[in-house]
Structures are given as C-alpha cells and as structure tokens.
Amino acid sequence: MKAAWLITIAPFAACEPVPTAERFIPDYRGVETMLLDDDLVQFRVSMTNALSARDVENYAECAAAGYTLIRGWGFARHLRTNVDEEAGVWTADAVYTISPALPRGIRTIDAEVVSAACAEKGIPTV
C-alpha cells in the first residue's frame, strides 16, 4: 500500500520549479540619496535576488562610500540601517555621517577601501 502511494505522488515531485542562475544574480535597482545636514546623509537602496539582509546592507554601504568620495571626503560612520523585504524586493534605509578625517566610533569606513571592495564584488556605488 505504501509503495502505491509513493508511485502516485512521484510525478508531482517533478513539478517543483528548479532554481536558475538568474535568481542568484543580484539586481541593484538604484539609490536615493538625501542630504539631511552638511555631514549627515540618508541612503535608500533597493534590490532583488538578495540572498540575505546583509546583501542589501552592503549595497547601502557601497552607496555611502561612493557618495563620500564624490563629496571629496574620505570617511563615513554608520549610524543605522533598516532593512525590509516585500515580494522579493529588498530595501535598506541607511544613515551615515561623512567626514574628511576618520570619525570616532566603531562602525567607520574608509571610503576608498570600501569603494574598491565594492567594485571587486560588482556592487555599484552612487
């Protein structure tokens, strides 16, 4: 009886969609940059095909590094990042302070180093 049951459901097991490579290639959908103060910047990024929240956080960090360099400064300090996912679209709302010198704090980034790492990983900056 068990064997008959397995035989009848076996054809339906093949109906599961097989993941394709395209589902694992990040699709970076853009960055919105808002200057909140002279050295305080908010970044809103969105992407699909992220494997985890860390992917969209990295995208926001790359945007912050690129923006910092565009402003002619060299460093940024991460203040906060809120991540959300809805219907496969990941978003991050991140705030950084930017500065010409290394700021105080534990979550600081050297914009040149981070931008180079982003380029190596194929993550766009601003």
PLM segments and residue spans:
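C-terminal motif of bacterial Sec signal peptides marking the signal peptidase cleavage site
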Residues: 11-14
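Secreted/extracellular ectodomain signature
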Residues: 16-126
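Sec-dependent signal peptide recognition
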Residues: 1-8
